[in-house]
UniProtKB/Swiss-Prot annotation:
Protein name as catalogued: Olfactory receptor 2A7
Residue intervals passing through the bilayer: 25-45, 54-74, 97-117, 149-169, 205-225, 240-260, 274-291
GO biological process: G protein-coupled receptor signaling pathway; sensory perception of smell
GO CC annotations, alphabetized: membrane; plasma membrane
Membrane topology: Multi-pass membrane protein
Residue ranges, Cytoplasmic side: 46-53, 118-148, 226-239, 292-310
Listed InterPro entries: GPCR_Rhodpsn (IPR000276), GPCR_Rhodpsn_7TM (IPR017452), Olfact_rcpt (IPR000725)
Amino acid sequence: MGNNMTLITEFILLGFPLSPRMQMLLFALFSLFYAFTLLGNGTIVGLICLDSRLHTPMYFFLSHLAIVDIAYACNTVPQMLVNLLDPVKPISYAGCMTQTFLFLTFAITECLLLVVMSYDRYVAICHPLRYSAIMSWRVCSTMAVTSWIIGVLLSLIHLVLLLPLPFCVSQKVNHFFCEITAILKLACADTHLNETMVLAGAVSVLVGPFSSIVVSYACILGAILKIQSEEGQRKAFSTCSSHLCVVGLFYGTAIVMYVGPRHGSPKEQKKYLLLFHSLFNPMLNPLIYSLRNSDVKNTLKRVLRTQRAL
């Protein structure tokens, strides 16, 4: 490595190559989506905390999912909004590495929380008489905390491998935030180990957990079909359909981006997929759960009636 090599200490996020007018339109639109994300997920967390009838394992995990979605959006969207207003405004090296680490942490944690939530539904429908014994508060807390810890530890592995790399090729990141594969393309050193770990990590936290969710829901479907009453079947399907929608949105986009073919898939297409993944998914999750969930809707109505009475 030459002594005259200049190392990069800040990056410029290229974002989306659009006209200034279109960038201002996207700024207004994404700001609105961001506000809806914070409001929707914040409302879910608030309702679960306020109503003791929602103090059950299912809503306990849902509150953690809402917190992850808030953190997910707060990590990527503000920087994206800044770049829409000022496309050449740089992000520091430390800020970029922090954003990469936090994105991976929240993404992995959400993967694992969705698995835990599917297991909760499996126990509730397939083993209803043993549900309280199996899904005790100690077990639920352990599952939630373990999901967060694994998310942090796996992200630390990627960060430790990323930090020693010198960046001297270019300071322009072809993305709207510091996404790890886009950052690796700027390194002026061998990144084969990093790329292998990204793929291995994606397979371990996406394909493996998704397979376990599929198995859980296969068992759930079998149990639902054995229910005699149509009302019981309808209620069971309604309980699981919200979670299945969220699983499909999250895992579908994530698997295409990180486990799909390395070649032949346009970079811009994956960038827009990740935009959907990081901006629209967190906004849609509270809508999916609240629209399909009578408990959440009833709690919201009670809170609104109480506020009007005051």
